[in-house]
Curated annotation (Swiss-Prot):
Protein name: Phosphoribosylformylglycinamidine synthase subunit PurQ
Gene, per the UniProt record: purQ
Keyword Calcium: no
Higher taxonomy: Archaea, Methanobacteriati, Methanobacteriota, Methanomada group, Methanobacteria
NCBIfam families: FGAM_synth_I, PRK03619.1
Tree of life domain: Archaea
Length: 218
């Protein structure tokens, strides 16, 4: 299965994601910000980092690059798309997932392990978890506070993917830190599953996000 890993100037989790996709048994390949056609791919991951230095707002400039038009086309073709951290911010900026990720309640970069609850298992990335399972993954961001004007709609549509369990380190509304589109195929998560995918890192909970992509394709 061919999975694209999108690179922007300032991406910094691209190699980690590529590595973990290989461990999961996928055939990952890097894709640059100016690529206009991703038809040959079966799925795409937008990794974390500081695309374009987080100028204006995290994700704002990456959102207007040619590759994001190609991602929209993949979504129309019903192929899975996962955005992690800066990737999640980009997916929110282009409107492929509901709501926004904005400046943390305590407005500084925050890096720590978190406990999370998996709120829906209908996405390709969470299909290997049990609903309401508690997992551990780290967060590392300055602009990760989730907000939506009409949060009840997001809950009612089963679009909440991850919720902080216990401590809510950035002040996200309802502790939400992962959301998906209505189909469930486009998923944006602020915590880093690729940093929780090998025993040596302290958790393997995140690995299921990547194995789930392969399982989804059957
Ligand atoms: N780890 C990351 O992807 C960082 C996300 C983003 N640049 C922020 O600080 O909010």
């Amino acid at each position: 299965m061919r999975v694209g890993v999108i690179r922007f100037p300032g991406s910094n989790c691209d190699r980690d994601v590529h590595h973990v996709l290989e461990l999961a048994g996928a055939e990952p390949e890097y894709v640059w910000w100016n690529q206009r056609n991703l038809d040959h791919l079966d799925a795409v991951v937008i990794p974390g980092g500081f695309s374009y230095g987080d100028y204006l707002r995290a994700g704002a400039i990456a959102a207007i690059t040619p590759v994001m038009d190609a991602v929209r086309e993949l979504v129309r073709e019903e192929k899975p798309v996962l955005g992690i951290c800066n990737g999640a911010q980009i997916l929110a900026e282009v409107g492929l997932v509901p709501g926004v990720f904005t400046v943390n309640e305590h407005p500084k970069f925050n890096c720590q392990w978190t406990e999370l609850r998996v709120k829906t298992t209908r996405t390709p990335f969470t299909g290997l978890f049990k609903k309401d399972e508690v997992i551990r993954m780290p967060v590392a961001h300055a602009e990760g506070r989730y907000y939506h004007d009409n949060i009840s709609e997001v809950w009612e549509n089963d679009q909440v993917v991850l919720q902080f369990h216990g401590e809510n380190p950035n002040g996200s509304l309802d502790g939400i830190t992962g959301v998906c589109d209505e189909s469930g195929l486009v998923c944006a998560v602020m915590p880093h599953p690729e940093r929780a995918s090998e025993e040596i890192l302290g958790s393997v909970d995140g690995f299921k996000f990547f194995r789930g992509i392969l399982k989804f394709r059957g």
